[in-house]
Amino acid sequence: MSLLTTSEAAARLGVKNETLYAYVSRGLIGRVRSDDGRSSRFESDEVDAIVRTRRGGPVAGDQPGSPIAGMVIATDVTTLHPDGVRFRGRNAAVCARTMTFESTAEWLWSGLEPGPSVTWASDPTVVAAAVRASRLLPSGALLPDHLRVMTAVIAAHDPMRFDPRPEAFMAATRSLLAALVDALPLRRPGAPPKLRLGEQAITGSLAARLWIRLSPLRPDPGALGAMNGAMVMLADHELATSTFGVRVAASTRADPYACISAGLGVLAGPLHGSASAAVHHLLVAASQPEGPTAAVAAMLRRGDRIPGFGHPLYPDGDPRAVALLDLLRASASNRRRMAIVDGIEAAVGRRKPAAPNVDFALAALGFVAMMPPDAGETIFAIARSAGWIAHALEEMSEAPLRYRIRAQPRP
């Protein structure tokens, strides 16, 4: 058996070391630990097989029956590792404790720290138009429904949206996300609280502006930090399904609003962005007098899958959930509700050891802060828009219309 070093394997594949590690985390390639326990080796035959399949044929680890089997998209935006997610080389869990969501977005887009002139402000005229359109929706419409409608309205108010320059893409996204948040109805009147990160006290953060539109509670510094941390952790996750949809849109040279609309459409599926709503309903059931164990038992009796546990890319546990739950436990002022969250985790763990995933952690944040069930998808949509645009910008540097998949008769 011929073994290659990490650098040798990456060179043969024509990718960076970080991308090779992402292949490992996605199960596309195996690795052999070196004797020192710190470095890895890769079987040359397996590396060569991937090189061949990139010219056509399936890659191990693809979904069975996938029409895009064998497709690997090189990216510098985000890589997945067993110990966590990295945004352009930065550990996302560290970013969640030390950076605002806005700074994280700027880093994902350009790999640079934002300058003092960069603002995330909304246009009051555009916000008013978005609010008017939003009010036309039926009373039972979900918050993500409002986001999709308002995105189209905000786009129509930007005659320069077809400017393909990266700086124009980024400017449009800043104003869009700010307007989407500011157009949501307030659940807690008053000015947004200050976000505290270390010694910094930040006024007008997107996390604070979103908090007062989702929660009726006044957050303590730790709770608002958990909200910002959730947005940071969710900002990107490599080539999730919605991100692939955005890259396809960008390959047609769609404008930033259309790219985000593409992502929002894919995110609407119950297996993606709205997965946290099912966890929220479980937590509500667990808050009844019978308690968490009874709520889990009732789901099992109905033959339902317990939502919010396990992740195919993280067999040893989702590091995003660990980071977010740590932030939440350190801050939770609503101890009774946090105890219910812990009770669900313990009840599931007694039946079969399973680690919570980021959907569970996101639902826990919303439940503890007394947000509505669709708050998780709303936070997810706003946060993931940052990563979508990072991938759209990267895709704009590639050949256009490169995702032309051939059709064949069904067997």
Description of each model-found segment:
Residues 2-8, 12-411:
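Hydrophobic alpha-helical bundle cores within soluble ligand-binding/oligomerization subdomains
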